[in-house]
């Protein structure tokens, strides 16, 4: 069947080659790799000593590392990694030059797997729609890093949570959605979330910042409890959501030529 739009990858005489960005434990990279260990890939990282890099080396995969803290401090005299601008783009250009040298060409797909740097506009434009990321929530509704989308879903009264694999563009996790995980019911945490939900209802809380503010005013430590519970739920979501859909998106959908885009519309 011929897809509408432009295919992300067209299988021909070779398999998909991908680059995987890691900054921490590399568990998403593990799942992508384990789903098809034979595919050619390269790992890049801004944190040279992270577990994800060590795992890649144990697998004899080529690795590119460029410490972001040292780079920006030495090259630009900047203590904090910038989100935009020439300085930010220069880092991405340096990393991707090394990645392309290692692969002897451009990657067919770039998988951000716990890569803790926002992608700059140069990289987003150059490789769109060949960059994937996974968001720990429904990216159409709840933004933020880590546990925050889960906390926002709880405050909004959602009955379940899900994770999202999406194409990275210049927005903050607002790129076109490729696939979402099954819904993970929050009912299994009803008892642990009881006090939090009652507080939300009593104080008519609508946002995460409002929850934090009112919890501190009341001195009830529920802001700490909400964060801890959201992290616990996120861990389950990672196992039952991220680890299921990310490898599937890479190997079963894109690598087999089953995905195309027409603008922001995914086919």
Task: Identify the meaning behind each predicted range.
Residues 1-267:
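One-carbon transfer enzymes
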């Amino acid at each position: 069947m011929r897809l509408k739009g432009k295919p992300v990858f067209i299988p021909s005489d070779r398999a998909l080659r991908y680059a995987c960005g890691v900054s921490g434990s590399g568990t998403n990279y593990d799942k992508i790799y384990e789903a098809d260990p034979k595919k050619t890939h390269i790992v890049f990282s801004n944190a040279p000593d992270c577990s994800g890099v060590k795992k890649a080396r144990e697998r004899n995969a080529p690795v590119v590392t460029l410490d972001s803290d040292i780079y920006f401090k030495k090259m630009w005299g900047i203590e904090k990694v910038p989100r935009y601008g020439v300085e930010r783009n220069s880092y991405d250009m340096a990393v991707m030059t090394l990645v392309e040298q290692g692969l002897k060409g451009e990657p067919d797909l770039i998988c951000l797997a716990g890569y803790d740097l926002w992608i700059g506009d140069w990289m987003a434009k150059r490789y769109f729609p060949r960059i994937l990321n996974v968001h720990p929530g429904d990216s159409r509704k709840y933004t933020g890093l880590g546990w925050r989308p889960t906390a926002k879903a709880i405050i909004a009264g959602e009955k379940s949570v899900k994770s999202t694999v999406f194409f990275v563009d210049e927005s903050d996790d607002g790129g076109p959605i490729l696939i979402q995980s099954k819904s993970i019911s929050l009912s299994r945490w009803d008892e642990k979330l009881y006090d939090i939900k009652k507080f939300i209802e009593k104080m008519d809380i609508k946002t995460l910042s409002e929850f934090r503010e009112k919890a501190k005013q009341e001195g009830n430590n529920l802001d700490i409890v909400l964060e801890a519970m959201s992290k616990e739920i996120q861990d389950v979501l990672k196992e039952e959501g991220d680890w299921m859909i990310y490898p599937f998106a890479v190997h079963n959908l894109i690598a087999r030529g089953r995905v195309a885009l027409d603008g922001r519309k995914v086919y």
